[in-house]
Swiss-Prot record:
Keywords, alphabetical: ATP-binding, Cell cycle, Cell division, Cell shape, Cell wall biogenesis/degradation, Cytoplasm, Ligase, Nucleotide-binding, Peptidoglycan synthesis
GO biological process: cell division; cell wall organization; peptidoglycan biosynthetic process; regulation of cell shape
PANTHER family: UDP-N-ACETYLMURAMOYLALANINE--D-GLUTAMATE LIGASE
Compartment(s): Cytoplasm
Family of the protein in this entry: Belongs to the MurCDEF family.
Domain of life: Bacteria
The encoding gene: murD
Enzyme Commission (EC) number: 6.3.2.9
Protein name: UDP-N-acetylmuramoylalanine--D-glutamate ligase
Species name: Roseiflexus castenholzii (strain DSM 13941 / HLO8)
One Pfam family, short name: Mur_ligase_M
Purpose of the protein: Cell wall formation. Catalyzes the addition of glutamate to the nucleotide precursor UDP-N-acetylmuramoyl-L-alanine (UMA).
SUPFAM superfamilies: MurCD N-terminal domain, MurD-like peptide ligases, catalytic domain, MurD-like peptide ligases, peptide-binding domain
Family matches, as NCBIfam families: murD
Entry annotated with the keyword Electron transport: no
């Protein structure tokens, strides 16, 4: 791809690193780079500082139609919908529309393993990366992780495995470009981002882009516990392409087409495969005693990563070593501290009800739940029922989704004590500390997005951690 001298426009600088990586990459390739973002400079200070000294023009606090008419290539932030009127202007003027990931896929010389899913994708991505690094120490892990993939390109050779976390927003762009990873893995599918996709069907179609453009023989790793993914397997694909995994539910993986599968049988994680001679092999990868991650949902994440690693040819002993060493991911059921007999857990990454339900099911102790926030057009009925069964109290944060959650709690006839909604996070945490009894858990697992009170869910989790650590 020739970029030297091209008029390149980066739409959306952002604060997670992707926009910075794109702008830096384009500038170093000799493109004439303009970065445009609706946010003012003060909101983007860290990103602007990271680009200091590079020949980049910034248009902040607005988008200008003239910039889109003059651009030869527009690289959009995944949060920008493909239907944006500014992108329509650029297309009409003949500009190529790209994203960081479409550029990366076109330029990456190494094999790409992609992971997506409503929940579990970050844990699975990082665990899969750890498994591959046991055998290939130069493995690169990037994607939807606040790590720019383009920044990693100089260190990637034809033999360097690359593990990427891919959101539904990113997959939309990859689908438009006809790009899919060598190995595709979908951890879970449940309602999410319906404010963007509109319908569950459209959301599923976006997730399916991860395998839609694979080559014959490329593996796709699917969850046997998911009726949606079992239905995906009906499409016309060679049976050898299907690799299955199952969590602790004990799904009947043997009835599904395809010879390869990773599943829990009692306390053992089994890899089932067919040799080139046609014989069936069963290998014990690890046991539950090897697992440090909490929660039944993480057993499924381990099985998913194992299935993808085995499909890539990683030896069982390397997988086992990675499982034993892997202690978890920041902002996902992250233990913050214990104070006065109360445990504080940061699960801010639970931005959808399904993820928060999984968090509630992880613990046996009574829970003081901190929930609520911005709406993503998702139902809260199941979340409310789970709260009614497992929480001793719920502390609500202010946001557009919180009235819906309140209505769902009333409909569930939940007898749980309800506090809030709070528009002051410190006040909400002071209440949590006051009402939590020794032996209980204060769990930040909102089931909602963070916008309004926070810049993003990571800001919410960082603030939770800071306030809790300040308690004396």
């Amino acid at each position: 791809m020739h970029l030297n001298g091209k008029r390149a426009l980066v739409m959306g600088l952002g604060v997670h690193g992707g926009g910075v990586g794109v702008a830096r990459f384009l500038a170093l390739q000799g493109a004439e780079v303009t970065v445009t973002d609706l946010r003012p400079p003060d909101d983007l200070r860290a990103s602007l500082d990271a680009l200091a000294g590079l020949p980049i023009r910034f248009v902040l606090g607005e988008h200008r139609e003239a910039d889109f008419r003059q651009a030869e290539i527009v690289v959009r932030n995944p949060a920008v919908p493909p239907t944006s009127r500014y992108l329509q202007i650029a297309r009409a003027a003949g500009a190529a529309i790209e994203m960081e990931m479409t550029l990366f896929f076109r330029l990456c010389p190494g094999p790409i393993l992609g992971v997506t899913g409503t929940k579990g994708k970050t844990t699975t991505t990082l665990l899969l990366g750890a498994m591959l690094r046991e055998q290939f120490p130069d493995t690169v892990v990037a994607g939807n992780l606040r790590i720019s993939a383009l920044d990693q390109l100089p260190s990637i050779s034809a033999t360097t495995p690359v593990v990427l976390e891919l959101s539904s927003f990113v997959l939309e762009g990859l689908g438009e470009a006809g790009l899919s990873p060598k190995i595709a893995c979908i951890t879970t599918i449940a309602p999410d981002h319906l404010d963007r996709h509109g319908t569950m069907e459209a959301y599923i179609q976006a997730k399916e882009e991860i395998w839609r453009h694979q080559r014959p023989g490329d593996p796709v790793v699917l969850c046997a516990d998911s009726p949606i993914m079992r239905a995906m397997a009906v499409v016309d694909r060679r049976p050898g392409d299907m690799v299955w995994f199952a969590g602790a539910k004990g799904s009947d993986v043997y009835r599904l087409k395809g010879d390869r599968r990773a599943f829990w049988r009692g306390d053992e994680l089994i890899w089932h495969d067919r040799s080139t001679e046609g014989s069936i092999t069963h290998t014990v990868i690890c046991t539950r005693d090897d697992v440090r991650l909490p929660g039944a949902h993480n057993l499924a994440n381990i099985a998913a990563a194992t299935a993808a690693a085995c499909a890539f040819g990683i030896a069982p002993e390397h997988i086992r070593r990675a499982v034993r060493a892997f202690a978890g991911v920041e902002h996902r059921l992250e233990f913050v501290r214990e104070l006065d007999g109360v445990c504080y857990i940061n699960d801010t990454a639970a931005t959808a009800p399904e993820a928060a339900i999984a968090a509630l099911r992880t613990f046996d102790a009574p829970i003081v739940l901190i929930a609520g926030g911005a709406d993503k057009n998702l139902p809260f009925d199941a979340f409310a029922r789970e709260i009614a069964q497992r929480a001793s109290a719920v502390i609500l944060l202010q946001g557009s989704a919180t009235p819906k959650l309140l209505d769902a709690l009333r409909a569930a006839r939940a007898s749980v004590a309800i506090h809030g909604p709070y528009d002051d996070f410190e006040q909400a945490l002071d209440t949590a500390r006051r009402i939590a009894a020794p032996g209980e858990i204060v769990l930040l697992s909102p089931g909602c997005a963070s916008f309004g009170m926070f810049r993003n869910e990571f800001h919410r989790g960082d603030t939770f951690r800071r306030i809790v650590q300040s308690f004396t």
